[in-house]
Amino acid sequence: MKNLTLVPLGGLCNRLRALLSARSLVDHGHELRVRVVWDVNRDCAARYDELFEDHFTPTGQFVFSKSRWLDAPAVWRHNLRLPALFRSFVYSVQRADFHSDWAAVECLAHFEKWRRVYISTGLQLCQTPPEVWRGLRPVSPLRERIDALCQRMGAHTVGVHIRRTDNIKSQSVSSPQAFEREMRAAIAANPAVCFYLATDDSALRDHFVQCFPGRVVYQAGDPTRATREGMEAAVVDLFVLSRTQRLIGSYWSSFTDTAAELGGIPLTIARG
């Protein structure tokens, strides 16, 4: 594989999984050139460079590109899968929703016989080492917001991420009552504990602030992720959660998993 066009799909953290794993491929494939099509849409309402500093393109092997019709994932109800048909004249192979747990060298070997590869996915292409995640750096204004929130946290802070709204799988396993039990257990274990709470449900956020007076730090504002401002807030929440001592998170949530992986912190999934 000499040239890879990667179309990261889904929300912020799904896209980061795909993107950073592609970065891992570059570390092991020195002739590989990666073109990333980061489309701004209802799943992710901001460009990568509006959220993070670019530590990819200085390598000379990464290019972020605007989306073209030919780059669109093949979805019958949207485009009758026509882009995939036309891509077959341009690319050696196409993979939709590709995912592997291979090491980077194994993934490169899998695609070795194809010169031009197209992948659209919200999953990792290969294993991503912790140091690649640690290289992810929010833009300066967001770092300032992250630091300000971290300064408000106590020495014993547990992160809490509650995913509600459109994630039915998460709601079916990680109920508000399950989070409350985990938080009360944390207080019983350490009466000095406080919490950083990130959630997409403002009513639930207010409920927990009342349940645990003086213990809950959170980012003020509308928790929607449908705007650029909302995506900026998501990055802030993600990095603040990653700086807590441990995380109580939601089942089937890439945001929960990414926060824990980013910080290298223990993760407990609220269940029940």
Locations of the language-model features?
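A short, glycine/small-residue-rich beta-strand->loop->alpha-helix junction that serves as a flexible
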Residues: 8-17, 167-173
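Histidine-anchored nucleotide/phosphate-binding helix
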Residues: 15-29, 179-187
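Short hydrophobic beta-strand segments
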Residues: 1-9, 33-35, 116-126, 155-164, ...
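Active-site regions of enzymes building and remodeling cell-envelope glycoconjugates
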Residues: 49-54, 212-219, 265-267
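Secretory-pathway luminal glycosyltransferase catalytic domains
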Residues: 45-189
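Catalytic donor nucleotide-activated moiety binding site of glycosyltransferases and closely related
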Residues: 161-165, 184-228
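Short, solvent-exposed loop/turn segments at secondary-structure junctions
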Residues: 11, 38-43, 124, 163-167, ...
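A donor-sugar binding/catalytic signature common to diverse glycosyltransferases
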Residues: 10-11, 16, 20, 234-272
